[in-house]
């Protein structure tokens, strides 16, 4: 893994670690924010609020371990793909939320 790739994995891993920790610590606040934005159907708010944090933490740990050279390349790439998909979903969510304002 190149230095730039490792640094990127570590940086994204740290962002996901912070975000995931906050979402796990306060799923009610996450659910309330989802409700306030009004983008997703109400029945999905609770499940998403409970799942988002753990998913972010798993991706964070895999990226941090991969960036530090403690994880094989394939699982690190899978985690990177998961982070990209999460980022794309978040971007789409933000665009929809902005359209509502």
How would you name each of these model-derived features?
Residues 1-101:
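Membrane-interfacial helix-loop segments of redox and metal-homeostasis proteins
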């Amino acid at each position: 893994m190149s230095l730039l790739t490792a640094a990127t994995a570590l940086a994204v891993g740290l962002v996901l670690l912070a975000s995931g920790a906050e979402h796990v610590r306060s799923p009610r606040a996450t659910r309330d924010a989802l409700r306030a934005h009004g983008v997703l159907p109400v029945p999905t708010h609770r499940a998403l609020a409970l799942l988002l944090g753990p998913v972010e933490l798993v991706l964070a740990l895999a990226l941090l371990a991969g960036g530090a050279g403690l994880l094989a390349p394939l699982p690190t790439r899978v985690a990177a793909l998961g982070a990209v998909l999460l980022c794309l979903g978040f971007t789409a969510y933000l665009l929809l939320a902005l359209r509502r304002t």
